[in-house]
Amino acid sequence: MAIDFTMHIPQTDVIAQERIPQRKLYTGALMPAMGLGTFNNDRFSFEDIARAVCGALRIGYRLIDCAAAYRNEKEIGEAIAQAQKDGISRESMFITSKLWNDKHRPEDVIPTLKQTLADLQLDYLDAYYIHWPFRNTHAPGAQKEDRHPDSRPYCHELYMETYRELEKAVDMGLIRHIGTSNMTRVKLEQVLRDARIRPALNQMEMHPSFAQPEFFEYLRSEGIQPVAFSPLGSPTRPDRDRDEADVPVLQQPAIVEIAKKHGIHPAVVCVKWAVQRGQAPIPFSVYYNEYHSNLKSVTEDPLSEAEMKEIEKVDTNCRLIKGVVFLWEGAKSWKALWDEE
């Protein structure tokens, strides 16, 4: 059944493109400094997400972040097609997707990419990420203590086998840029040493409680645009990624106080901070008022330098998306995934 994309959007809610900050990639291409994520965490229907994508495009979003692992690319493809019928050009959009861990074998990469393109009803992607730097997978509903018998530590040679297929995809015109994701500096330095086509983006967890300042500055020094997932601290993340020591980002006193001062939600403070810092955040929401206020926030009432400094103090190096389900037998801690032990 076709998805009903009927919605009433006041013209005053539409945000002009020239008001939205842009990021210039090393290729010279421009990418919006703010986008919409599409990971539903099994809490919303694929149709709800597709309607949010269509609504977001109608009000001014142009960066849409997808992934095959989210299992909703066919529905999102319908939303993108509808937006084009509405008069929003493909060239104005920046659509990204990601290659899942079980498709890293060289013979699987291009066919998987072509399936994503078919599902999204596109001829090319603006960027294609390697979702995780491992071929490790997990069973549906896996818990913290579960270990897949085939999981292994990072292997650079295997990663580069996959990466070289993305380089071929650039040559074929199927993708415009290569993205890395869930990486560390140690791993990325090896990729930069061996890559024929440099990655243009790196997607990573970033929010005020986990700002990753050293890695962030390293990426910028290498001409790689940091893209922030979970920019609000992922309050709806899976239980397997929760620990008692986790810090709820939106409840941080400094964030709450700044939000009160500006008359906005703490989530909007996080979005403003991310964009003003130089990131490209991709918060997810199916709720119109939320994704509208997020985009509108980056066009007005910026945080002061003093407020940005206050938010810097919130950083507790608290990683929330730990990836425990990708650990291998014998691994002592999720930190092994991040080269921290």
Regions found by a protein language model. Name each.
Residues A2-M93, I110, L232-P235, A336-E341:
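N-terminal binding-site loop/beta-alpha segment at the start of enzyme catalytic domains
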Residues K24-Y26, G77-R90, L117-L122, L192-A195, ...:
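Acidic (Asp/Glu)-rich catalytic clusters
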Residues M34-E47, K98-E107, D150-E157:
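Active-site mouth loops of central-metabolism enzymes
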Residues R43-L57, R105-L120, E161, V186-E189:
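Short, acidic/polar
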Residues R62, D123-D126, R176, A200:
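Short acidic/polar active-site loop segments enriched in Thr and Asp
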Residues F94-E107, Y129-R135:
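Structural motif corresponding to the early beta-alpha repeats
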Residues N101, W132-E341:
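Beta/alpha (TIM)-barrel catalytic core signal, keyed to glycine-rich beta->alpha loops juxtaposed to Asp/Glu
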Residues V109-I130, K168-M172:
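CE4/NodB-like, metal-dependent polysaccharide N-deacetylase domain
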